């Protein structure tokens, strides 16, 4: 079964008989951001992909959360058909929302799932109203401007300034997909009920310096999702897959270890 033609797949080798890990990136990111993590998992079959509308998958058009869920389920089905082994999905940031929603829609597809600091504003844990990490302003009607604003807010204005002209242009080109992501999470009601999740779950978060609303969300998930395991990466903040790839690889192994024996 082929992978969806509209998606740019980032594979990292294959380990015969092992589980397959599918990494799902967050907003204004790309599959390549997991490359350092995947290099640290030689015993597993791993792949990532650019979500539809981002980077190498821009030609696939713009979709909301439901479209990203459909894509992940197609990728997971293709991976399982290729290997015959269990598939687990690990999502960073909004990629975690995609993973949870997919596992709710099709529990039999995944042996286990992992998420790192998934934004779930409907739980009531929001960014602080004061300081540099203030609440999100309304989405800009200019998607390129929204991409610049999002990047500067998440990484820092200085980091935006350090990008090359091409780097800034690439982020702006991802603006329409970013806007669709933001609107997916800020609708009239919750897009899913995470407490109904039946697939084994590992929830990752950064250390004390990560943003408080991320920690509160992860702590809530650990307390309210049956059987969920919380894994803290000391010293990490939101971009742990980039800054702490060894620890993110450990989180991934925890997810694989949670696959029920009967499913292996």
Language-model region placement:
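Active-site loop/oxyanion-hole signature of alpha/beta-hydrolase fold enzymes
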Residues: 38-39, 45-88, 250
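Catalytic active-site module of serine/aspartate enzymes centered on a nucleophile-bearing elbow/loop
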Residues: 226-264
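Conserved serine/cysteine hydrolase catalytic core
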Residues: 170-224, 229-232, 240, 245
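Gly/Ala-rich beta-loop-alpha elbow adjacent to hydrolase catalytic centers
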Residues: 91-95, 99
């Amino acid at each position: 079964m082929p992978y969806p033609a509209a998606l740019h797949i980032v594979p990292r080798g294959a380990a015969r008989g092992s589980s397959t890990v599918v990494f799902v990136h967050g907003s204004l990111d790309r599959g390549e951001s997991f490359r350092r993590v995947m290099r640290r998992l030689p015993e597993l079959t791993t792949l990532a992909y650019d979500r539809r509308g981002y980077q190498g998958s821009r030609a696939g058009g713009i979709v909301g959360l439901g479209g990203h869920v459909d894509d992940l389920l197609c990728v997971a089905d293709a991976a399982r058909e290729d290997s015959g082994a269990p598939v687990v999905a690990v999502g960073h940031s909004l990629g975690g929302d995609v993973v949870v929603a997919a596992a709710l829609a099709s529990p039999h597809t995944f042996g286990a799932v992992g998420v790192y600091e998934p934004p779930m504003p409907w739980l009531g844990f929001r960014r602080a109203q004061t300081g540099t990490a203030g609440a999100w302003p309304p989405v800009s009607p200019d998607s390129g401007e929204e991409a610049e604003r999002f990047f500067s807010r998440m990484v820092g204005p200085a980091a935006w300034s350090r990008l090359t002209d091409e780097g800034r242009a690439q982020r702006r080109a991802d603006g329409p997909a970013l806007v669709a992501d933001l609107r997916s999470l800020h609708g009239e009601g919750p897009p899913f009920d995470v407490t109904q999740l039946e697939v084994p779950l590992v929830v990752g978060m950064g250390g004390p310096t990560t943003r408080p609303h991320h920690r509160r969300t992860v702590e809530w998930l650990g307390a309210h999702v049956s059987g969920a395991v919380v894994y803290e990466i000391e010293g990490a903040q939101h971009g742990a897959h980039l800054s702490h790839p060894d620890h993110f690889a450990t989180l991934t192994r925890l997810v694989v270890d949670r696959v029920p024996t009967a499913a292996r």
